Regions:
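Extended hydrophobic leader/signal-anchor segments used for secretion and membrane insertion
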Residues: 1-149
Length: 149
């Protein structure tokens, strides 16, 4: 047994790092330019998998329709979204005369959009506009942009 003791530390270290990245931390690559200029395409994003309550303005990583995406939460349960389908503009909890749809965010759901409004497929255009809490993988705690040049 003593001759295998040197293996114990690397195995424990590997298991600890694996557990950390599968239960607490998320590290991924931003797949599109929908969050520009805030987070450029190809940036490394670091997230916290221990998601508590989400609020307006939080940037989240989630799985939706088989894809891992990054968007900003703009409406939480109970909020009302006034959406203009003609130009994609919206307001939250503030009535607007141009609204073509009025949506109330259900419990355990969120309305999310990309910061690059003209370059984002998000809650404004999805058939079901609401992202469920179960689809959320992590809340962003930072991003590290990499130039594509």
């Amino acid at each position: 047994m003593k001759k295998y003791r040197w293996l114990l530390m690397p195995i424990l270290l590997f298991c600890s790092v694996w557990l950390l990245f599968h239960t607490v931390l998320f590290v991924g690559v931003v797949p599109s330019s929908s969050m520009e200029p805030t987070i450029p395409e190809g940036s490394i994003i670091l997230g916290n998998r221990l998601v508590g309550s989400l609020g307006q303005g939080d940037i989240i990583v989630f799985r939706h329709e088989g894809k891992t995406l990054v968007k900003r939460v703009v409406a939480v349960p109970g909020d009302t979204v006034y959406l203009d389908d003609l130009d994609g503009s919206f307001t939250v909890n503030r009535e607007t005369p141009n609204a073509t749809r009025i949506l109330t965010v259900p419990e355990n759901c969120f309305f999310v959009v990309g910061d690059s409004r003209d370059n984002s497929l998000d809650s404004r255009v999805w058939e079901n506009p609401f992202l469920t809490a179960d689809e959320v993988i992590a809340v962003s705690v930072g991003a590290f942009p990499f130039a594509s040049e």
